[in-house]
Amino acid sequence: PMEQLILKMDDKSDVNVIAASAYNFRIELVKKVGKSDIPGLIDISHCMADRFGTQALLTKTNIPKYFNSETLPFLARYKGEIIGYIIGVPLEYFKQESWAHFDVNLSKKNTLYTYAFVVNSKYRGKGGYGKTLKRIYINWAKKQKYTYVTGHVEQGIARRFHARTEIVKVFPEWYGLKTPFEYYRRS
């Protein structure tokens, strides 16, 4: 059945360009992912899998689950090539997950969970691509009336975020990874 989904997919993604620079860098909000972007998305997800294990890999099967009209998926492109993405998902999508119940805002529909945020390693720390992607994502979330943006990061990382970021809970075990992860909330 998944192959049928992919066959029905348009070749090109349906996107809104949210920001563009004169230097061939742009950020797009994906309304519907197209076949031509699947290889680039899968490639870039390998940058996440190196740190977070194979469950972080995007596949032909799970891409439509995260890149659709119910989520907030943004792509960063440089010279037409996908160099990063960030995916926001309403917290309520995760109500079956035990970790989500530590968030007092579950079921209030005011929290956007950052499911994935990755920038190709050769573009990290250069040109501000990742920072720009994150800033646009957070501003867009606010425009969509989300009060909070949350996510999981390796322990110690969230304290480098915005001043209005709090650590809700530390998870010593996170999906078999060796380092503890913290669940943060940014207002």
Which residues fall in each region the model found?
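Conserved acetyl-CoA-binding loop-helix of GNAT-fold acetyltransferases
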Residues: A116-V119, G125-N139
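C-terminal "cap" of GNAT-fold acetyltransferases
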Residues: L7-D10, D14, V168-S187
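Short loop/turn motifs at secondary-structure junctions and domain boundaries
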Residues: P64-S69
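Conserved acyl-donor/pantetheine-binding loop and adjacent beta-alpha core of acyl/acetyltransferases
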Residues: I82, I86-A116
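Conserved active-site tyrosine of GNAT-family acetyltransferases
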Residues: A158-R164
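Short amphipathic alpha-helix that is part of the acyltransferase structural core
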Residues: S13-T61, P73-Y78, I82-I83
